[in-house]
């Protein structure tokens, strides 16, 4: 509104100037010259005032925010992997929050718009203005938004629940998408992760937490798949894993790379995403053929993986370790019953152990009743040829393979694994 008013006033002054200095048969008199000078000075003053038009402003609810600094920071993630990442974004500017909770940034950033920025608040005593919290979307301390040249942004938020309470007055369509993404993230967090402890001690609890995390990540990736806006999609991908670990959602990341590199092939972030999602940088995907590696078997023989798969209807390639408590639990509670139920019908398990000690390996196999199925290990710990060939970093992991060695599904555990095997063996 202020910009429109400036334009109207400029137009009025311009017309008056034309009237003062318009050609005449007579010379311009002294009074006309003084009027011309006055109008010129007023014109310059107005231009200077309008050039200081606030582009980003807002109101912060400070109640209950005694632990927070009365400051707002503006941060730019210059690369894709800097989005939602602590200590990486470049601090562009800062603004004081007054006692009434108001703040404003007068000078727009000299950036090629549209560009993703992050508005950040910090606790008292925090010396890094670009520290971003990602533990709890209800209280996280930043919000990403898109700066569009010529458009002012007006923010409202509760400083102690910054991300959850963040709102924009009359948001643009692209920023409306980010607000919708925030709402979806909050819903997914409350449904799947809230109350879950990262230090969950029980073996079953660890597997359940992994399942919940996957469900949370999938909701964010589904948003990225459904939106037509590039920058909100990039935020969704980063919120799915701020630490950049996409091993368990590799197929979803690959699909996103395919989508956005077709639409924005020249955008630097699309290129970064393409590099991350290169198949050589991801674990083997559903639909890929498993590498035909020569495996040292428990009995001392070396056999190619494809040879072990031949003539089977369904094979579980299980990557485990004697020291992996969730793996051991799955041996006893899931794999033993499945093997007993379906082995005679063409169901096989090939277990590869990340072992350094043959004795510990053998003891675990016998104790779990896992000596029913096939076992292999290079006895090189987690630095071994199979992990390298599968491009894996995390266990427990499994791959369900058809008779050709093609991956049908990955990383199914507990009831999900039972249901897949039951359905597959009954249908074929």
List PLM regions with ranges.
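A short beta-strand-turn-helix
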Residues: 294-315
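Conserved redox-active cysteine motifs that mediate thiol-disulfide chemistry
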Residues: 313, 319-334
């Amino acid at each position: 509104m202020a910009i429109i008013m400036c334009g109207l006033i400029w137009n009025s002054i311009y017309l008056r100037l034309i009237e003062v200095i318009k050609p005449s048969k007579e010379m311009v008199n002294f009074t006309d010259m003084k009027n011309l000078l006055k109008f010129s000075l007023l014109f310059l003053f107005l231009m200077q005032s309008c050039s200081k038009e606030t582009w980003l402003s807002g109101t912060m609810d400070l109640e209950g925010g005694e632990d927070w600094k009365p400051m707002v920071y503006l941060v730019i993630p210059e690369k894709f992997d800097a989005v939602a990442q602590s200590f990486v974004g470049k601090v562009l500017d800062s603004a004081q929050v007054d006692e009434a909770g108001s703040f404003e940034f007068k000078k727009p950033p000299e950036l090629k718009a549209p560009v993703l920025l992050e508005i950040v608040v910090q606790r008292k005593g925090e010396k890094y203005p670009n520290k971003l919290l990602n533990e709890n979307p209800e209280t996280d301390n930043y919000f990403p938004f898109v700066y569009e040249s010529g458009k002012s942004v007006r923010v409202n938020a509760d400083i102690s629940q910054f991300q959850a309470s963040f709102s924009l007055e009359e948001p643009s369509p692209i920023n409306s998408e980010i607000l919708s993404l925030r709402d979806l993230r909050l819903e997914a967090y409350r449904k799947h992760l809230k109350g879950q402890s990262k230090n969950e001690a029980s073996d079953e609890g660890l597997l359940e937490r992994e399942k919940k995390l996957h469900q949370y990540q999938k909701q964010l990736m589904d948003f990225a798949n459904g939106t037509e806006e590039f920058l909100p999609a990039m935020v969704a991908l980063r919120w799915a894993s701020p630490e950049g670990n996409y091993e368990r959602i590799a197929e979803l990341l690959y699909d996103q790379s395919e989508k956005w590199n077709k639409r924005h092939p020249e955008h630097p972030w699309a290129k970064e995403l393409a590099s991350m999602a290169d198949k050589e940088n991801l674990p083997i995907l559903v639909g890929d053929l498993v590498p035909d590696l020569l495996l040292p078997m428990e009995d001392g023989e070396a056999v190619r993986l494809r040879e072990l798969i031949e003539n089977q209807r369904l094979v579980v390639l299980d990557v485990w370790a004697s020291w992996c408590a969730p793996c051991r639990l799955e041996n006893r509670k899931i794999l033993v019953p499945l093997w007993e139920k379906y082995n005679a019908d063409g169901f096989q398990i090939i277990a590869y152990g990340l072992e350094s000690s043959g004795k510990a390996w053998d003891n675990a196999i016998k104790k779990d009743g896992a000596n029913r199925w096939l076992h292999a290990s290079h006895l090189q710990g987690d630095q071994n040829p199979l992990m390298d060939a599968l491009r894996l970093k995390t266990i427990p992991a499994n791959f369900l393979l058809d008779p050709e060695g093609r991956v049908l599904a990955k990383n199914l555990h507990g009831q999900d694994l039972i249901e897949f095997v039951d359905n597959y063996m009954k249908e074929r």
